[in-house]
């Protein structure tokens, strides 16, 4: 696995200086170093800005609806400030046994999520939203990936969590 760049301090939308039209044309609406790493592989100039949105799951919302809504809201939140730029928003979650799994945030929750996923089929749903400044339209694409986890024992899960620290990854 390629090592990630050191964590960057990504400004939130409220911490930004006034709009500068000489900046890049593409804005990544995300605080994720993983998404910045992926977009950086395309060797495009872009600016990364953390959107400030409520990421709570709405009642009755499916995993696919949830990630599509968040990707769209992230793109639109940043596009309000930068309406003349292409804005890319994205989100991902996993679903196991009908439960939406977000970022665990803590080691014990990461272990719990992976224990629940052991031997199960898990769907990772990734949504990408692109705001087009010419039309003010947001296009959203969804890619579900189905993974069948082999049975994992507790010590293997703990080793993985302690080594990889997947606390900011949906479903650990």
Language model: regions and residue ranges:
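Short, Lys/Arg-enriched N-terminal segments with co-localized hydrophobic residues
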Residues: 9-22
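N-terminal beta1-alpha1 ligand-phosphate binding loop
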Residues: 23-44
